[in-house]
């Protein structure tokens, strides 16, 4: 009798170790090595065939490790939320995009509430691209517009997600198309030049 059998009412083969991994992307390989995939299929009454090949996953990991040794590409993430978990999915998406392009991506958070015309150049210095993050409401909006205008006038690639993309469209309408009062009804219900993006 295995020692694990004495302490819980779980089959020995259904108890797996939570092994430390260098990256979360190694966890599926570590779990498969302990037979967790087959055990789950058995418990669910599903046929257990051949162990699924994780070849593509392993190749991704190899690329990820190789990319980590390359010179990083710096991307600024402009947003208002101090809690970095608010942008976790964006950071991971940028990191994975870097892996598939054989580059390490370093994401630098830039607080949009503290961004001004006077400090934007220093805040975005050395950035290969800028991501304007999502959010709601007025807080931090002015700083996003400052960042967008700076990146547009300095030819820095800029991406926007949700409100970030709306801000890019509004800044363009205001400063390129000449609609100084362009806005979104989300922020100004009475704007005469409403920009609504379908996304």
Segments from the language model and where they lie:
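N-terminal beta1-alpha1 cap of cysteine-dependent amidohydrolase-like domains
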Residues: 4-198
